[in-house]
Curated annotation (Swiss-Prot):
Comment on bound cofactor: Manganese or magnesium. Binds 1 divalent metal ion per monomer in the absence of substrate. May bind a second metal ion after substrate binding.
Gene, per the UniProt record: rnhB
Protein name per its UniProtKB record: Ribonuclease HII
Essential cofactor(s): Mn(2+); Mg(2+)
UniProt xrefs under InterPro entries: RNase_HII (IPR022898), RNase_HII/HIII (IPR001352), RNase_HII/HIII_dom (IPR024567), RNaseH-like_sf (IPR012337), RNaseH_sf (IPR036397)
NCBIfam families hit by this protein: PRK00015.1-3
A Gene Ontology cellular-component term: cytoplasm
Length: 193
């Protein structure tokens, strides 16, 4: 059964609604990236869904369409700040900054997950990237942005295979850490590191 990805946008049809999602929260290395997107409820881009369910090629195409047609913003919190304030607070900060940087002020903010925000406009939706078109669009922007950053870092540290694992704890990545030690981009606060 296909889910109506506009159910939340329709529920809040009288409001300016932004969707927010992050990429990189579970990674061992690099930044966490959050994106906020306000979709055009009349001009819906076809094919938008949770970024994890799309091929890299399809994500790249949708990234260009979303960034060309919708209001969007991205915020990046670097690994050093993640180590200072913890990954949850860094993720919340990235989400808040992404929303603040939008050129339109949203009245309702749909965010993937179960995070709690002091700003009452935030509405946390578990599995939101599969339930809201705005959140799904934000997931695409966040993932493509972070993946591109990790490809740049991979050129500096090719031994960690970030061009394949994007900093996540794959077997090959763990083996590379055991062989080469930590890079300057690894999150030192993570238990593994």
């Amino acid at each position: 059964m296909e889910v109506n990805l506009l159910q939340y946008e329709q529920k809040y049809h009288n409001y300016i609604v932004a969707g927010v999602d992050e990429a990189g929260r579970g990674s061992l290395v690099g930044p966490v990236v959050a994106s906020a997107v306000i979709i055009d409820k009349v001009d819906i881009i076809s094919g938008i869904k949770d970024s994890k369910k799309l091929s890299k090629n399809k994500r790249d195409i949708l990234y260009e369409q979303i960034t060309s047609n919708y209001v969007w913003s991205t915020a990046i919190i670097e690994h050093t700040e993640i180590d200072d304030i913890n990954i949850l607070e860094a993720t919340k900060k990235a989400c808040t900054i992404a929303v603040a940087n939008l050129s339109l002020k949203p009245e309702k903010i749909l965010v993937d997950g179960n995070m709690k925000f002091s700003d009452v406009r935030f509405i946390s939706i578990i599995n939101g990237d599969n339930l809201s078109l705005s959140i799904a669009a934000a997931s695409i922007i966040a993932k493509v942005t972070r993946d591109r950053l990790m490809l740049e870092l991979s050129a500096e540290y090719p031994q960690y295979l970030w061009h394949k694992n994007y900093g996540y704890g794959t077997r090959e990545h763990i083996e590379a850490i055991n062989t080469h030690g930590l890079s300057s981009y690894h999150r030192k606060s993570f238990k593994f590191c």
